[in-house]
């Protein structure tokens, strides 16, 4: 089979044998691809840091029966240096990469919009111009929209009656009207749903004027909606440092374990791990 080239974001990697690694890539034209990078763990490897998580690369691959083989790599954007130097940026970007892998679906199913969104979001985290918790929540909402799982925010999730509606129910699909509202629905302030809409639509002026309590509530609803559809917890999302105080000692210890998993491959591949997109 012929070699092929593609642009990709490195989602994660893990060890294979004494000198190789298996890398998981979100490519622009071929979707999720897993490939072997031979000799990459040697100190003189020609690939080196180009295949570290968070890297945006131009990669050439040789198709294989089970795993492709990386033959050439060129760096496009080196986001890792700015991301890994800061705990908050690092945990936020980890949550993005895990989400991207979960939403990408089957291997080799093209997801060009998800690829573009992920690159834009990593760029926004690396440059630090916007609040990282807002960038993350915007990314999660838009990524869910690409996958067809976006919560209903301006109409009833069940009957499509135009809103705004006060109630929100994750299993129902988002905001719900008084006639369709299931028991157990939450009733967040209207400003919370408006913030979620702003994050989805890229209205950064509104999003950045929001209050910490509203951001916290919106984050909770977004995370709950995502994980309900994924039918599993994201292992990186609880590590994300947001605007409220965290226990840095415990959180950084937990983040170190995730860093080891992603960078050094202490788990197998079967385990856990646009106009508006440009400003994600």
UniProtKB/Swiss-Prot annotation:
Alphabetic keyword roster: DNA damage, DNA recombination, DNA repair
GO cellular component term of the entry, any: bacterial nucleoid
A Pfam family assignment: RecO_C
InterPro entries: ARFGAP/RecO, DNA_rep/recomb_RecO_N, NA-bd_OB-fold, RecO, RecO_C
Chain intervals for the UniProt region annotation (Disordered): 261-280
GO biological process: DNA recombination; double-strand break repair
UniProt cross-references to PANTHER family, sorted A to Z: DNA REPAIR PROTEIN RECO
Family: Belongs to the RecO family.
Biological role: Involved in DNA repair and RecF pathway recombination.
UniProt name for this protein: DNA repair protein RecO
Species per Swiss-Prot/TrEMBL record: Mycolicibacterium smegmatis (strain ATCC 700084 / mc(2)155)
Native organism taxonomy: Bacteria, Bacillati, Actinomycetota, Actinomycetes, Mycobacteriales
This protein's encoding gene: recO
